[in-house]
A protein has these predicted regions:
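Helix-loop-helix module between adjacent transmembrane segments
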Residues: 61-62, 85-177, 226, 247-255, ...
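Alpha-helical transmembrane segments of multipass membrane proteins
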Residues: 25, 29, 152, 170-177, ...
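Membrane-interface "cap" regions at the ends of multi-pass membrane proteins
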Residues: 2-70
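Helix-loop junctions at the membrane interface of multi-pass solute transporters
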Residues: 31-34, 43-47, 61, 75-76, ...
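Loop-to-helix junctions at membrane interfaces in multi-pass transport proteins
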Residues: 2-10, 46-55, 72-86, 119, ...
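Loop-to-transmembrane helix boundary motifs in multi-pass membrane proteins
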Residues: 121-128, 138-139, 162-165, 364-396
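Membrane-embedded translocation segments of transport machinery
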Residues: 306-309, 315-353, 369-387
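Residue-level recognition of pore/gate-forming positions within transmembrane alpha-helices
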Residues: 21-24, 63-64, 91-95, 134-138, ...
Length: 396
């Protein structure tokens, strides 16, 4: 985006955005106060298995999805069309595998760290190696999850990147540190609602700008962006029913089979059946985000089909068109830009808090307790877990 193209932020927008951060932080303070007499490691990492299943389902809808799904799916539809929607089939199949193949194994183990499985099956060294790779991978992933939305925020507002990143990361660290897994789950539930509200807002306002959603659909159809039945077996074809369904199935199965954040939540529930219900319950929220992102891509194409921002030099690549559309469509409506910015940053917050909680659990369970000279008390483990959250935050 050009340096001189920034979004006009009114005081109302700042208030809307700030409220998002304040509410997320307040969740941490609430659970820190409510559980002040239950300060133990089991409560911090698994909520004593007394977490609302619906909240866990909503939390899972966000914790597995990449933070940039909103921007990337919309850009994909803008460039290549709606075939991307077939990833929903892969999501369905991957969810089934997670609920009925992976979750029963890890739930019955009843361990905070999922990498205990590797020690039982293969020995101590493979467990340590897998845990180490997980730590490195997660730090890199959540760093990128923080960087990309904050970069879009800077491009739209002109606020320096480091300030946005520092504030967002500090908010995440605060509510994760104070409230543990309960705060993470309920904060993500709040962030999910903000994300849905923001996406509906840009979809509605964008549709109005092009003469209605069906007008946008008609324009996209004329320019061959509406496509659902590409059954080609040519491996050079970007998107086909088979490629998306099968490819996303393996990706999503990995999310349920080797993702500490996901399995930590599922194993924080009272029974295996509840855990399986939660895995299935995460599917509607995930599909809703993907569908709204796809529809936003259709509207985005209709809005810019006669003046492609990349060709005109307004942006460098298609991933920047979504933030540009916010600038063009919403800049004159106080409050709405703040909601969309909150939507983007909420997507980052959910990924970061999930990662911090998972990193803390793995560090303590796999690298501190096994090498401790004597058994650690609950109080010591809790203190070390919180230090691990702060340390992970500093690395990010």
């Amino acid at each position: 985006m050009n340096d001189n193209e920034t979004l006009f932020i009114s005081s109302v927008d700042y208030i809307v955005f700030s409220v998002t951060l304040v509410l997320s932080t307040a969740v941490g303070f609430f659970y820190a106060y409510r559980d002040r007499k239950r300060n133990d490691i089991e409560n911090f990492h698994r909520g004593n298995k007394k977490i609302n299943p619906v909240a866990v389902s909503v939390s899972l809808s966000l914790s597995i999805l990449p933070a940039l799904t909103i921007i990337s799916v919309a850009a994909e539809v803008y460039t290549y069309g709606t075939m991307i929607i077939w990833q929903v089939v892969g999501l369905l199949l991957g969810t089934a595998a997670g609920a009925h193949f992976f979750i029963p194994v890890f739930y019955q183990m009843n361990k905070i760290s999922i990498f205990e499985y590797f020690q039982v099956r293969f020995g101590r060294i493979p467990k340590i190696l897998c845990s180490l790779f997980f730590l490195i991978n997660t730090i890199l992933l959540i760093s990128f999850a923080l960087y990309a939305p904050c970069l879009a925020f800077e491009a739209m507002t002109g606020i320096p990147l480091w300030i946005v990143m520092a504030i967002s990361a500090f908010v995440c660290m605060t509510y994760t540190l104070l409230g543990g897994i309960k705060a993470v789950i309920w904060a993500e539930t709040l962030q999910f609602m903000i994300i849905i509200a923001g996406m509906v807002c840009i979809l509605v306002e964008g549709s109005k700008a092009v003469g209605g959603f069906w007008k946008a659909w008609e324009v996209a159809t004329i320019h061959k962006r509406i496509e659902f039945l590409n059954t080609s077996f040519d491996p050079r074809t970007r998107h086909t029913i088979w490629g998306l369904s099968i490819g996303v199935f393996f990706i999503w199965s990995k999310g349920f089979g080797s993702n500490q954040a996901t399995l930590q939540r599922a194993c924080s529930l009272k029974t295996l059946k509840t855990a399986q219900f939660v895995i299935w319950g995460s599917l509607p929220g995930t599909v809703l985000i993907v569908v709204l992102s796809m529809l936003t891509g259709v509207v985005m194409f209709a809005y810019y089909h006669t003046c492609d921002p990349v060709t005109e030099g307004r942006v460098v690549k298609n991933d920047q068109i979504f933030p540009l559309m916010i600038l063009d469509v919403l800049s004159g409506t106080p409050g709405l830009p703040g909601l969309i910015l909150a939507c983007l940053v909420s997507a980052a917050l959910s990924s970061i808090s999930s990662g911090l909680s998972a990193l803390s659990a793995v560090l303590i369970e796999d690298f501190v307790k096994p090498f401790s000279c004597k058994p650690l008390s609950d109080r010591t483990q809790l203190l070390l877990s919180k230090i691990a959250v702060m340390g992970s935050w500093n690395l990010v």
